C-alpha cells in the first residue's frame, strides 16, 4: 500500500490518472444530487420506505442511492452491464459476431463495443419507461402524489433524462478506463456502494442502540464481515501454478540449459463479474414485476425478493453459470496449449497436443467449480443472515465482494503499470 501511495506522488503520469479518476467521481457524485423534473422529494422518500430490504433497495445500492432519490443517474450503469451480458451471449451464439470478436482485432473489439452501446440505449429506454409509468401513479402514505403533473410530458422528460444519464455514465466509465485507473464501469458501481457506507453505518448503529441487534448478533456480524473480507482477499489473490518446462537449446557453439517456470491460473479467474451479472439479470424481472399492481403478480414478485427460496436458487444458478461462462471467455485451454507448443514449452509428464488440452481443461474446471462455490457462499450466506436476524441488507457479501474485488483489481492494475514503468526505464539503459 505504501509503495502505491509513494508512486502516486512520485510518478507524474500515474498521479494524473489518479486525479482524472477522482475528477470523474466528483462529476458522478454531483449528478447524483440532480433529481428528475416533476418529482416531490418528500413524497418520494415516504413512499419508498415501504421498499426497504427489498430487491429495490439492492438496486439502489448499485446505483449509489440514485434510484431512491430518482436522480438523473437513477439507472446507474446497470443497463450497460445487462447489455454486456447479452452481447457476450450473442457473441458465443452467433458465428459472425464470434469471428468479429476473435479475428478482426482492434476493429472487431471496436464494433462489439459499438453494438453494446446500442443495446445499452435500448435497455435503458425500456427500464426508464417502466420507471416513468410506475412512479407517475404513486402516492405517499400521507396521500401526497409523488409526481406533481403525471402527464405524457413527464414520461417523455423522465425517459430522456434517465437514458441521457445512463449514457453519460457509460461515457464517464469509458474515460476512466482509457485515461484513469481501473475499469470504469466497476469503479462507478464501487463509488456508488462506498458513497452509501455512512448511511448504512448510521442505520446499523441505530439498530444496535435501540436493541434490535443484540450483543451476540453484533459479534456474529462483525465476525462474518471479517471472515468475508479475508476469504475474498485470499481467493481473489490465490492461484494454481502449473509447472512449465522449456527444453535446452543450442545457439552456435553455446548450449543453453532448459529452464522451468509456471503457468499461473487464478482460483477465481472471473472475479466479481458473475455476481454483478447475476444481480443485473435478477433485477430486471424483480423491478418489472413490482411495477404491476396485481395480487397474483405480487405473489410472483415476492418470489424474486432477496431471501426467498426461488430467488436464492436462481441467484446461485446464475452465479455458477456466469462463473463457467466468463472463465471460458477469459481462458481457452486450446489456445493455451497452442501457445505452449509454439513457444517450445511443455507440461512435465503430459504429452503436447490434445493431452495438454485435456489436462488444462481438467484443472480449469476444478478451479471454476471451487470459484463458483465460493462466490455462491459469499453471496448467499449474508442474505440468509440478514433475513434471520433482520440485519440491514446493505451488509451483504455481494457488496463486500464488489468493493474488495474492484479494489484488488485496481491495485493490480497500478502494480502492472509500475512494473511496465520499471521495465521501460531498464530497456532505455
UniProtKB/Swiss-Prot annotation:
Q: What is said about its interaction partners and assembly?
A: Component of the Sec protein translocase complex. Heterotrimer consisting of SecY, SecE and SecG subunits. The heterotrimers can form oligomers, although 1 heterotrimer is thought to be able to translocate proteins. Interacts with the ribosome. Interacts with SecDF, and other proteins may be involved. Interacts with SecA.
Q: Which residues lie on this side of the membrane: Cytoplasmic?
A: 1-13, 99-111, 179-181, 236-267, 330-360, 415-429
As for subcellular location, the record says: Cell inner membrane
According to the record, the parts of this chain that enter the bilayer without crossing it are found at: 65-72, 73-77, 78-98
Ranges per topology, Periplasmic: 41-64, 133-154, 201-214, 287-307, 386-393
Keywords recorded for this protein, A-Z: Cell inner membrane, Cell membrane, Membrane, Protein transport, Translocation, Transmembrane, Transmembrane helix, Transport
| GO molecular function list | protein transmembrane transporter activity; signal sequence binding
Q: Which organism is it from?
A: Aquifex aeolicus (strain VF5)
Q: What is the stated purpose of this protein?
A: The central subunit of the protein translocation channel SecYEG. Consists of two halves formed by TMs 1-5 and 6-10. These two domains form a lateral gate at the front which open onto the bilayer between TMs 2 and 7, and are clamped together by SecE at the back. The channel is closed by both a pore ring composed of hydrophobic SecY resides and a short helix (helix 2A) on the extracellular side of the membrane which forms a plug. The plug probably moves laterally to allow the channel to open. The ring and the pore may move independently.
What is this protein's record name? Protein translocase subunit SecY
Q: Which GO terms describe its cellular component?
A: cell envelope Sec protein transport complex; plasma membrane
The record's comment on protein family reads: Belongs to the SecY/SEC61-alpha family.
Q: How is this protein positioned relative to the membrane?
A: Multi-pass membrane protein
* Membrane-spanning segments: 14-40, 65-98, 112-132, 155-178, 182-200, 215-235, 268-286, 308-329, 361-385, 394-414
Annotated GO biological processes are:
protein transport by the Sec complex; SRP-dependent cotranslational protein targeting to membrane, translocation
Query: By its UniProt entry, which NCBIfam families does this protein fall under?
Result: 3a0501s007
Amino acid at each position: 500500500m505504501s509503495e502505491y501511495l509513494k508512486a502516486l506522488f512520485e510518478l507524474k503520469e500515474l498521479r494524473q490518472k489518479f486525479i482524472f479518476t477522482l475528477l470523474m467521481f466528483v462529476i458522478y457524485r454531483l449528478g447524483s444530487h440532480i433529481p428528475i423534473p416533476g418529482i416531490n422529494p418528500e413524497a418520494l422518500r415516504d413512499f419508498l420506505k415501504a421498499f426497504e430490504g427489498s430487491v429495490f433497495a439492492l438496486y439502489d445500492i448499485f446505483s449509489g442511492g440514485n434510484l431512491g432519490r430518482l436522480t438523473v443517474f437513477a439507472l446507474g450503469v446497470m443497463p450497460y452491464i445487462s447489455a454486456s451480458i447479452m452481447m457476450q451471449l450473442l457473441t458465443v451464439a452467433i458465428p459472425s459476431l464470434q469471428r468479429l470478436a476473435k479475428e478482426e482485432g482492434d476493429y472487431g473489439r471496436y464494433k462489439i463495443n459499438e453494438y453494446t452501446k446500442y443495446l445499452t440505449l435500448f435497455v435503458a429506454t425500456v427500464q426508464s419507461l417502466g420507471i416513468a409509468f410506475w412512479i407517475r401513479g404513486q402516492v405517499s402514505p400521507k396521500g401526497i402524489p409523488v409526481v406533481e403533473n403525471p402527464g405524457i410530458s413527464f414520461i417523455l422528460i423522465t425517459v430522456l433524462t434517465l437514458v441521457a444519464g445512463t449514457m453519460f455514465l457509460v461515457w464517464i466509465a469509458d474515460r476512466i478506463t482509457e485515461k484513469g485507473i481501473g475499469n470504469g464501469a466497476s469503479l462507478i458501481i464501487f463509488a456508488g456502494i462506498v458513497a452509501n457506507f455512512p448511511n448504512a453505518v448510521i442505520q446499523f448503529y441505530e439498530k444496535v442502540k435501540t436493541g434490535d441487534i443484540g450483543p451476540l448478533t453484533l459479534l456474529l456480524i462483525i465476525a462474518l464481515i471479517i471472515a468475508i473480507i479475508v476469504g475474498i482477499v485470499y481467493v481473489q489473490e490465490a492461484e494454481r501454478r502449473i509447472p512449465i518446462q522449456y527444453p535446452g537449446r543450442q545457439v552456435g557453439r553455446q548450449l543453453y540449459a532448459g529452464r522451468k517456470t509456471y503457468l499461473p491460473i487464478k482460483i477465481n479467474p472471473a472475479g466479481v463479474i458473475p455476481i454483478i451479472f447475476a444481480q443485473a439479470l435478477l433485477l430486471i424481472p424483480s423491478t418489472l414485476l413490482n411495477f404491476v399492481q396485481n395480487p397474483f403478480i405480487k405473489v410472483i414478485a415476492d418470489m424474486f425478493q432477496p431471501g426467498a427460496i426461488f430467488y436464492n436458487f436462481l441467484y446461485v444458478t446464475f452465479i455458477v453459470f456466469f462463473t463457467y461462462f466468463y472463465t471460458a471467455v477469459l481462458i481457452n485451454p486450446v489456445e493455451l496449449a497452442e501457445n505452449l507448443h509454439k513457444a517450445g514449452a511443455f507440461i512435465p509428464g503430459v504429452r503436447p497436443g490434445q493431452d495438454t488440452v485435456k489436462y488444462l481443461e481438467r484443472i480449469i474446471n476444478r478451479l471454476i467449480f471451487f470459484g463458483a462455490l465460493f462466490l455462491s457462499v459469499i453471496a448467499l450466506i449474508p442474505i440468509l443472515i440478514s433475513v434471520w436476524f433482520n440485519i440491514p441488507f446493505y451488509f451483504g457479501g455481494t457488496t463486500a465482494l464488489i468493493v474488495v474485488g474492484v479494489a484488488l483489481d485496481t491495485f493490480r492494475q497500478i502494480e502492472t503499470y509500475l512494473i511496465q514503468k520499471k521495465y521501460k526505464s531498464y530497456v532505455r539503459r
